[in-house]
């Protein structure tokens, strides 16, 4: 049975302050710095709004990390924080130790405040946590505005919730005093009309990561593209489920041109994810030619490409230093894989993650990529599931990974011989072939983690795995 440490005298004295209706800002100025985090938590959780307002005005650190306390935001407590900031911004209070420069509404670890409070009590909190320099966090901060608000936006409802509505209105009314910095923007379901209003409020060149997964049509994406081009510090772009059906070829060409030319302005882009994006077919070269930076990650998944698109992959210097290449779910059946071989040769010195799951690659195509694959010495993860290849081809593939000493995870398809004429996996045969293949691998090298996987089960949607024994699917 654990015994709770009794509160220290200083903590008890601090809590009594929160119950003092006549609490004055001058009293808080004399409060030891170490008491501010635990007392702020107490005031926030118990909704002592007047005390919160005063504590914000007397906050002795550069940054107020409010985000982790906003899991279940209370409008009254949030408004009290804003009222305290107003008093500072309008100089209604004069403080000897006004340090607060950043209101941080980003989502940090839930136990951040608890760890912070305990560390403060032990006098061991690193200065980097207490007084992290805000100038390092936002390229737009140059001391022009006294307060910066950091926020990550996830727009998944049709309209903004009360908390965001209150914040945006507050920022808009204090133009010139408050800089709103959004680094991460996720659009997962909101109507674009409402998204547009938000994009007009935030500083677009602060945004570093964008995810779009709203089932947009290509014309809606075209409406978004002018805003994308203003995100000059963008490092990561995720684009999913863009539908280009029901528009003429002329319109499609026009919209694709509008979108791809924005990449000319994105000179910090490092990670590009395109999932189920139908307009790439026949237009991949148009996008790649506009990339002006070297990507670390390129993911083109569940897309339809032409063979000519695959040929363009190895042409452009922007993908010559890839660490991650993910083409999973993009059908490459009946394509020549020589262009993929050329690309693998080009990125062999840097590639760490290669995913070719469910590409429809067959025996006759595999040999083309084996020489280049065997020279990807930095590879740590290789996934090749869902490709219908024979036992002999799979053995040949495994032999070409002998010298890849950095491999930590390998995922291979169950051999074609594991299935009956109806395409249903025969578990006993799969187990036998899995054991034989594992034995041959271990005779050549000691793999760290290797799995043989069946196709997806039509009943449960999972794969069966072989890792020394068969792990059945869930149905």
From Swiss-Prot:
Signal peptide location: none
Keyword tags: Leucine-rich repeat, Repeat
Cross-referenced Gene3D superfamilies: Ribonuclease Inhibitor
Repeat keyword on record: yes
Gene: PRAMEF20
GO molecular function: ubiquitin-like ligase-substrate adaptor activity
Upper classification of the organism: Eukaryota, Metazoa, Chordata, Craniata, Vertebrata
InterPro entries listed in its UniProt record: LRR_dom_sf, PRAME, PRAME_domain
GO cellular component terms given for this protein: Cul2-RING ubiquitin ligase complex; cytoplasm
Organism per entry: Homo sapiens (Human)
GO biological process, one term: negative regulation of DNA-templated transcription
SUPFAM superfamilies: RNI-like (SSF52047)
Superkingdom in the source lineage: Eukaryota
Protein name, UniProt field: PRAME family member 20
LRR repeats: 97-124, 179-203, 204-230, 231-265, 266-291, 292-323, 324-342, 348-375, 376-400
Family under the similarity heading: Belongs to the PRAME family.
């Amino acid at each position: 049975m654990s015994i709770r440490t009794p509160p220290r005298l200083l903590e008890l004295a601090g809590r009594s302050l929160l119950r003092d209706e006549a609490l004055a800002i001058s009293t808080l100025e004399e409060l030891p710095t170490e008491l501010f985090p635990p007392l702020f938590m107490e005031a926030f959780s118990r909704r002592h709004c007047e005390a919160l307002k005063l504590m914000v005005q007397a906050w002795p650190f550069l940054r107020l990390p409010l985000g982790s306390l906003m899991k279940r935001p209370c409008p009254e407590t949030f408004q009290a924080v804003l009222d305290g900031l107003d008093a500072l911004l309008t100089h209604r209070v004069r403080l000897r130790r006004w340090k607060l420069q950043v209101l941080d509404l980003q989502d940090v670890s839930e136990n951040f405040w608890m760890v912070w409070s305990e560390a403060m009590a032990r006098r061991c909190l690193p200065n980097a946590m207490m007084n992290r320099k805000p100038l390092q966090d936002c390229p737009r901060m140059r001391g022009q505005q006294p307060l910066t608000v950091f926020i990550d936006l996830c727009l998944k409802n049709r309209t903004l919730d009360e908390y965001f509505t209150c914040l945006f209105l507050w920022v808009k009314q204090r133009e010139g005093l408050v800089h709103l910095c959004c680094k991460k923007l996720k659009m997962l379901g909101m109507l674009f009309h409402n998204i547009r209003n938000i994009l007009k409020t935030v500083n677009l060149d602060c945004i570093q990561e964008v995810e779009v997964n709203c089932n947009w049509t290509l014309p809606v994406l075209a409406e978004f593209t002018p805003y994308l081009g203003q995100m000059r510090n963008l490092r990561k772009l995720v684009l999913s489920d863009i539908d280009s059906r029901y528009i003429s070829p002329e319109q499609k060409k026009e919209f694709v041109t509008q979108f791809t030319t924005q990449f000319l302005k994105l000179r910090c882009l490092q990670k590009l994810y395109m999932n189920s994006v139908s307009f790439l077919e026949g237009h991949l070269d148009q996008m790649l030619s506009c990339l002006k930076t070297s990507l670390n990650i390129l993911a083109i998944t569940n897309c339809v490409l032409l063979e000519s698109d695959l040929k363009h992959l190895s042409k452009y210097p922007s993908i010559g230093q890839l660490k991650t290449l993910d083409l999973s779910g993009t059908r490459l059946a009946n394509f020549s894989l020589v262009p993929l071989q050329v690309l693998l040769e080009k990125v062999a010195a840097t590639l760490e993650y290669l995913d070719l799951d469910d590409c429809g690659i067959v025996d006759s195509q595999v040999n083309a990529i084996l020489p280049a694959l065997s020279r990807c010495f930095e590879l740590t993860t290789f996934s090749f599931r869902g490709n219908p290849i024979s036992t002999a081809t799979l053995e040949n593939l495994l032999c070409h990974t002998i010298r890849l000493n950095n491999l930590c995870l390998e995922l291979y398809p169950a051999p074609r011989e594991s299935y009956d004429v109806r395409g249903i996996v025969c578990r006993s045969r799969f187990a036998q072939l899995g054991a034989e293949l594992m034995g041959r691998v271990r005779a050549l090298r000691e793999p760290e983690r290797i799995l043989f996987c069946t196709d997806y089960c039509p009943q449960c949607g999972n794969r069966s795995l072989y890792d020394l024994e068969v792990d059945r699917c869930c149905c």
